[in-house]
Amino acid sequence: MIGLIITATISVTLIMVLLVVAGTFTWVERRLLGFVQERLGPNRVGPFGSLQWIADTVKILTKEDRPPPGADKFAYILAPAVAATPVLAGFGVIEFGDGLSLAAVDVGVLFLIGMLGLTAYAVVLGAWASHSRFALMGGMRAAAQMLAYEVFLGLSLMGAVMLAGSLSMNAIVEAQRDVWFVVLQPLGAALFCIAGVAAAHRLPFDLPESENDLVAGFMTEYTGMSFGLFFLGEYLAVLLVSALAVTLFFGGWLGPWLPGPIWFGLKTGVIAVVFVWLRATLPRPRYDQLLSFAWKIALPLSLANLLLTGIVVVARSAS
């Protein structure tokens, strides 16, 4: 009973920390976008606008949340929760330090891929439930994008898994004590980051919510906290993909002088800032170009990287 209470307390604490980090990340993103676009960004609430995300949260909580006419109310309400919950669950197996995780799962990588994949179902569910043509088109785009990018997302990280010989997050990090896997797997790391951007539905792969032609895509009919949960799920997905990239390719918590969790946080922050930089600088491609890149370029490269890694691993074990 005491162990259950301790686990529940740690879980709630982790969720609260993640919510604060996600909110702070929205402020960092807006400030960086303002810098790139030569404007100020948030600068009114708190020092340098650092409390703007709290004001936005209060605003969202006080807005009316009403399903549109003709919507499937149960699915409409369920979809935002499905968008945020799997991502929060994914952080439960992330190794923030040596043995510092909520749940030490031997197949942590597989679990995380499954959790990231569930976010696409939330998009499709919300799009279908909204009873809107714009939302439905966004949901169809999300389904096609998920089929394309989830495939090579899994294939791109298999190189690191093969080098470590395990699906355990801890074992993968420990295998990088001599050299980070980004050195041994540069192509795999690049492909994983590209697929991660698509999995999080971030620019330039945010076609399911493209404002130019779909108003707000699958979120067109959402308001209030329902919209906020979709928004939260997206930013948490960015942080989760960044944390997974750090674990797989950038040595996890390993580093000199500083404690492991600090190294992990710094590395994750750098990857997340790269996501923001991509949003600020890259244009949104056409949808056919998005899918063509996935099936015709990224997937063959992922298979080639996997084959080459397999040959190297077999040759190393034979020698």
Swiss-Prot record:
GO terms for molecular function: NADH dehydrogenase activity; oxidoreductase activity, acting on NAD(P)H, quinone or similar compound as acceptor; quinone binding. The keyword Transmembrane helix applies. Coiled coil: none annotated. It is a multi-pass membrane protein. It is found in: Cell inner membrane. GO terms for biological process: aerobic respiration. Its main location: membrane. Its EC number is 7.1.1.-. The chain crosses the membrane at residues 1-21, 74-94, 107-127, 147-167, 179-199, 238-258, 262-282, 293-313. Disulfide bonds: none annotated. It catalyses: a quinone + NADH + 5 H(+)(in) = a quinol + NAD(+) + 4 H(+)(out). Pfam families: NADHdh. Belongs to the complex I subunit 1 family. PANTHER family: NADH DEHYDROGENASE SUBUNIT 1, NADH-UBIQUINONE OXIDOREDUCTASE CHAIN 1. NDH-1 is composed of 14 different subunits. Subunits NuoA, H, J, K, L, M, N constitute the membrane sector of the complex. This is NADH-quinone oxidoreductase subunit H 1. It comes from Rhodopseudomonas palustris (strain BisB5). The lineage of its organism: Bacteria, Pseudomonadati, Pseudomonadota, Alphaproteobacteria, Hyphomicrobiales. The gene is nuoH1.
